[in-house]
């Protein structure tokens, strides 16, 4: 079994780089929001969109909560109780952290590739928006959504939190309708450029040929 302090560090490392990128992103976003006008907005199906949002919120609760509780276990002798108890087998922890890191790295690379063009879903598209096709976007069209699923699956295995399969199912339920709604706007905005991008790059899975 992986020591709990090591497990907490493994959860914290990608979070640190994510926080740095998020601060930079929101700083740029708030500056540009005042001088840029949004145009098209996706017509989301609310039940599917809210299912996806619920899944993402659960992801953050499990990620931050698991990391914090594992760290608090270091003070068991002081508190007299354990904050979190995980009995995952070593193979489950290792495979879980591999899947978790695949998702976390994809998440970080997506933020880096998209930069200021990554928009909160309801905000719409800026007039000066460009189609990002680098990094993870060169492999699949919606890498951020896929990263959510990988992170949740990884956490469920690494921390033995099998209830996370419920929010994972919610995200899987909401991904396709939400992505389709966004792509309708992107096709309208970018025309043939996005149509060609769709032919070349898979939506949620890489195109092998």
For each feature predicted by the language model, list its residue ranges.
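Membrane-anchoring alpha-helices and their flanking helix-loop junctions
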Residues: 1-130, 152-209
């Amino acid at each position: 079994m992986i020591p709990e302090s090591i497990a907490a560090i493994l959860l914290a490392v990608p979070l640190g780089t994510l926080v740095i990128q998020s601060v930079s992103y929101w700083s740029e976003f708030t500056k540009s929001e005042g001088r840029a006008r949004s145009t098209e907005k996706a017509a989301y199906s609310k039940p599917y969109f809210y299912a996806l949002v619920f899944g993402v919120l659960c992801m953050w609760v499990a990620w931050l909560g698991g990391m914090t509780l594992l760290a608090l276990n270091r003070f068991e002798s002081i508190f007299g109780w354990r904050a979190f108890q995980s009995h995952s087998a070593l193979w489950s922890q290792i495979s879980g952290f591999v899947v978790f890191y695949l998702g976390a790295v994809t998440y970080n690379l997506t933020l880096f590739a998209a930069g200021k063009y990554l928009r909160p879903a309801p905000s719409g598209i800026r007039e000066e928006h460009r189609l990002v096709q680098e990094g993870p976007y060169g492999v699949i069209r919606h890498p951020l959504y896929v990263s959510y699923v990988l992170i949740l699956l990884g956490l469920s295995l690494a921390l033995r939190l099998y209830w996370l399969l419920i929010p994972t199912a919610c995200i899987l339920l909401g991904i396709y309708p939400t992505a389709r709604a966004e792509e309708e706007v992107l096709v309208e905005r970018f025309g043939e450029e996005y149509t060609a991008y769709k032919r070349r790059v898979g939506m949620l899975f890489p195109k092998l040929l």
